[in-house]
Design a protein with these regions (language model features):
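N-terminal Sec/SRP start-transfer signal
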Residues: 1-19, 183-188, 197, 233-281, ...
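Hydrophobic alpha-helical transmembrane segments of multi-pass inner-membrane transport and secretion
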Residues: 6-33, 41-75, 99-112, 226, ...
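Hydrophobic alpha-helical transmembrane segments
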Residues: 8-12, 48, 143-148, 188-192, ...
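Short helix-loop junctions at transmembrane helix boundaries
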Residues: 27-38, 110-142, 199-217, 607-668
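Juxtamembrane interface at the cytosolic side of transmembrane helices
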Residues: 64, 72, 164, 210, ...
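Basic-flanked hydrophobic alpha-helices used for secretion and membrane insertion
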Residues: 301-558
Length: 668
């Protein structure tokens, strides 16, 4: 192991790092303090997902590195065999090496994991935005689980090594490290399959507009892009190199001759390695940018959906002769809060109607109950001018009967004259309602950040009479699926988050008492939501996602760096003899270095360039999916994606600088 420390040291560091990351997530799940905090479900689910992904990646990465180590050591093991050491003795050596690897790698990883566990709990506090009663001490169950899992992986690697040695003869072992590959054929079918798969994946990513469809097709698009990447790196790169070789003016230059011929004879393995680096790099950037955008968007979502401390949503059905007394409801809220010792600084009420419509480009109407493409569907919100003022804090628009103010933009192709028509079974029903768009107002954030899958369209009408007409129209079209009318009470309080949560709990206890809601009219349900509670849930989910994204991102980055390192080291040893020959026939030191730099640049920066292209095509798909979580600010996603790409590129360049030196030292 000491003699091969150039290979074993990164392996031990990788094993320790993977062990530490796995232990941290396992310890967070096993910590009894998790069950004592609000939003613990999100942390538990995130960590369990992380453990599964980290476990799969650890198995793949460790077995990959083990395979590389065995190939590099075949000559050494073959020499032992020729000198008289039997296969049983070689197997015993490998068993001892595996034992030392387990002690140093797993043991060191557990020590690091215990230290990082405390750091992880400290890092989660600012991410989740609420206190965490973690114990932070070493977790014996997590240590046992981690040690058993990675011990099993090392046993599996040992079994594979012993099997390889058993099937080999001394001559094969002696020359195993020098076994080269035949020149690969140009596989046009694979290249065509790769181009089709990559094009199909890109097409899905760019053209999908419906968020629900984006969620369903995301993994299909990812699978197609992965297949396309592997096929094109394997077949396309070979075709490109052979085309370069046919170009005599290009090929018969010192640097080009060495680089092209050297890569061509090992292209099958190199191409798969480059594809691995590309896919892992893409995963790191997508994971970090997506989770960061989700996390940073939480503040905007909470501020928009909860303009006051409490949102009290009351639904009532006019078909059942129900009607809410807004003044009575406001009086109840004021009285109850006063009894609980919580000062109320204001209660605003907004009444609105919400149902889905089809923005039919053929008829130029907003059709209720009509069937059509999801991309033409809109979540229609209708509210009074008074409700607009309550939700936004702006002055109420002055509207005449039959007029409307459009908040945001109308669907493409629609003018100022709007007609809302009911459709039932393909036929028109009810009295169509015509509205003249008299004013244009900014979008209402309260509706824009909802979790509705359809794009919101908000119209402000003059009064409750128009709301009643529109409710009657959609009731005829949708029948049993008709929407109720909704009122929201926005309650501003002067209290701490803890007092706010206690007030909500007290309301829930008192609301079951008979006569509690006397004087508020009749209604179907009354739901109370707290800004403080939403912050706990929102940041619990988004913070858990971001923490998981960071941990898995580090693991994926570790895998990327190790694949790059071992790839460059293996190429360095394979090229060592070739460059020695070239120097003997007159190649200068400067020419050797120039040739190395050209190869390393291609090997390193082709994967990151392709990964950047993947990110650009994937942007629309990620942005659409994030709308399902309420993140509709595209600029937030743009900044997170661009920042992640820039940061990853900086790390990538640093790895390049370090690896280029290692490669050059070997061939020198």
């Amino acid at each position: 192991m000491k003699q091969n420390r150039r290979f074993f040291l990164p392996y031990l560091l990788a094993l320790a790092g993977l062990t530490a990351a796995f232990y941290v997530m396992s310890a967070l799940c096993a910590d009894p303090g998790v069950l004592e905090m609000r939003g613990f479900e999100y942390v538990m689910v995130m960590m369990q997902i992380g453990m599964f992904v980290a476990g799969v990646l650890s198995a793949v990465l460790l077995l990959y590195i083990n395979s590389f180590l065995m190939k590099q050591r075949k000559k050494e093991l073959g020499l032992y065999n020729i000198l008289g050491m039997g296969k049983g003795n070689i197997a015993l050596i490998q068993c001892w090496e595996s034992l030392f690897t387990a002690i140093l790698g797993i043991g060191g990883g557990l020590v690091l994991g215990v230290a990082f566990h405390k750091l992880a709990t400290l890092a989660l506090v600012p991410l989740l935005k609420f206190s965490i009663p973690f114990h932070g001490s070493a977790s014996l169950p997590a240590m046992v689980e981690t040690a058993v899992f990675f011990g099993f992986l090392l046993l599996l690697a040992l079994a594979l090594n012993l099997f390889r040695v058993r099937l080999s003869n001394p001559i094969e072992l002696l020359h195993g490290g020098n076994v080269g590959e035949k020149e690969p054929r140009t596989r046009w079918l694979m290249a065509a399959v790769g181009a089709v798969c990559l094009g199909a994946g890109y097409f899905i990513a760019v053209t999908v507009k419906d968020p629900a469809l984006a969620m369903l097709l995301y993994f299909l698009a990812v699978l197609l892009v992965i297949i396309g990447t592997y096929c094109l790196f394997t077949a396309g790169s070979i075709a490109l190199l052979k085309l370069l070789r046919k170009n005599k003016g290009f090929y018969y230059q010192t640097g080009h001759f060495i680089g092209v011929s050297g890569m061509l004879y090992r292209m099958k393995r190199n191409a798969v390695g480059l594809a691995n680096i590309c896919i892992l790099s893409t995963m790191v950037m997508v994971m970090l940018s997506g989770t960061l955008a989700l996390y940073l968007g939480q503040g905007e979502i909470i501020a928009a959906q909860y303009p006051a401390n409490l949102n009290m949503t009351v639904s009532f059905d006019p078909a059942q002769n129900q009607d809410l007394d807004l003044d009575g409801a406001a009086s109840l809220v004021n009285r109850f809060a006063r009894e609980q010792g919580v000062p109320v600084t204001g209660v605003d009420a907004a009444e609105y109607l919400h149902f889905n419509v089809l923005a039919n480009p053929a008829t130029g109407r907003l059709e209720v109950g009509a069937q059509g493409e999801n991309t033409d569907r809109r979540a229609l919100y209708l509210l009074t001018a008074q409700g607009y003022a309550a939700l936004t804090g702006d002055r109420a628009p002055s509207l005449q009967p039959g007029e409307a103010a459009v908040c945001g933009a109308l669907p493409e192709g629609f003018g100022p004259e709007l007609t809302i028509q009911g459709i039932d079974g393909g036929r028109e029903v009810g009295d169509p309602q015509s509205l003249h768009s008299a004013q244009a107002l900014p979008e209402i954030e309260y509706f824009r950040t909802t979790f509705d899958m359809n794009e919101p369209l908000c119209l402000v009408v003059s009064d409750r009479t128009m709301l009643a007409r529109l409710w009657a129209l959609q009731s005829q079209a949708l029948d049993n699926y008709a929407a109720n009318r909704t009122a929201v009470l926005l309650v501003d309080l002067e209290c701490t988050n803890e007092e706010e949560l206690a007030l909500v709990d007290a309301w829930a206890d008192a609301s079951v008492n008979e006569g509690f809601f006397d004087g508020t009219g009749t209604w179907e349900y009354w739901r109370v939501e707290s800004r403080a509670e939403m912050a706990v849930d929102g940041y619990g989910m988004a913070g858990g996602f971001l923490f998981l994204g960071i941990v898995l991102g580090i693991i994926f980055l570790m895998a990327t760096v190790l694949i790059i390192y071992y790839k460059q080291v293996s190429e360095g040893y394979e090229d060592q003899g070739r460059f020695e020959i070239m120097r003997k026939v007159g190649l200068s030191q400067r020419q050797v270095k120039s040739s190395i730099r050209g190869q390393v640049l291609i090997v390193f920066f082709l994967p990151i360039l392709v990964a950047a292209v993947h990110i650009l095509f994937d942007f629309n798909l990620v942005a659409r999916m994030l709308t399902m979580f309420g993140v509709r600010n595209v600029m937030t996603v743009v900044l997170c994606t661009g920042g992640t790409l820039a940061a990853f590129l900086a790390v990538y360049v640093l790895v390049y600088l370090l690896t280029a030196r290692t490669y050059y030292k070997i061939v020198k």
